[in-house]
Design a protein with these regions (language model features):
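Helix-start/capping segments and mature chain N-termini
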Residues: 1-55, 62, 166-172, 183-195
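Short, glycine-/polar-rich solvent-exposed loops and beta-turns at beta-strand/coil boundaries
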Residues: 12, 30, 67-73
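Small/polar-residue-rich segments within soluble enzyme cores
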Residues: 51-58, 70-181
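ATP-binding catalytic core of ATPases
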Residues: 59-67
Length: 196
């Protein structure tokens, strides 16, 4: 009898390149943050679903019933929250640990690397530098004009799981590494720009 396989395909973010001025000062950069994703098909019972929904709704101030509904989806990949900082990451790690210890529940919540765009010089040269949207795509200025150069290539993790949702042996996982974006060096000088 053939094993009924399901593929989980997870996207891994690529780090966007940094924009520098003529003297090497950072004008735009990406800092590490995390994305919280859930694999609802891996829940084995309602107790696990309720514990996960309670924990996630408390950490992120989300509606419990909305999160509980998400835990019932027949999906390997549901985004719970994007771009969380390290304090929230610690709470998620504690929740993952609690689910494993108290509910024998693992493989349902994951933290994936993500990036958040920062502009250390604030509005300085913002008309030139531009900005990115929530999907990290350049929308104005240098961020837009050099988007394909700055953005890099996202990676993927493809995992085969049997019909019961348990991971198959390691050989069924395929990783495609993400490639970080390129840096851009501008000819403008931030000290001169700030005096204009």
């Amino acid at each position: 009898s053939a094993v009924d396989l399901q593929l989980a395909d997870t996207t891994v973010s690529a780090k966007r390149g940094t924009i520098y001025d003529a003297n090497g000062n950072v004008l735009a950069e990406s800092a590490s943050v995390w994305q919280v994703v859930m694999s609802p098909v891996n829940f084995k019972n309602d107790k696990q679903r309720q514990a996960a929904a309670k924990g996630l709704s408390e950490i992120f101030d989300l509606e419990y019933n909305d999160v509980l509904d998400d835990t019932k989806q027949q999906s390997h990949y549901v985004v719970v929250k994007r771009r969380i900082e390290s304090d929230e990451r610690e709470k998620v790690l504690e929740l993952i640990d609690t689910l494993k210890k108290d509910y024998s529940c693992s493989g349902v919540i994951q933290l994936l690397d993500d990036y958040k765009r920062y502009y250390p010089k604030n509005s300085l040269a913002s008309s030139v530098i531009g900005f990115t949207g929530s999907d990290d795509q350049g929308l104005e200025g240098i961020e837009y004009e050099y988007d394909s150069y700055l953005s890099g290539t996202p990676g993927r993790i493809i995992t085969a799981q049997n019909a019961r949702g348990t991971d198959m042996p390691f050989r069924y996982e395929q990783n495609v590494e993400s490639e970080d974006g390129n840096n851009v060096y501008l000819t403008i000088d931030e000290t001169i720009q700030s005096n204009l």
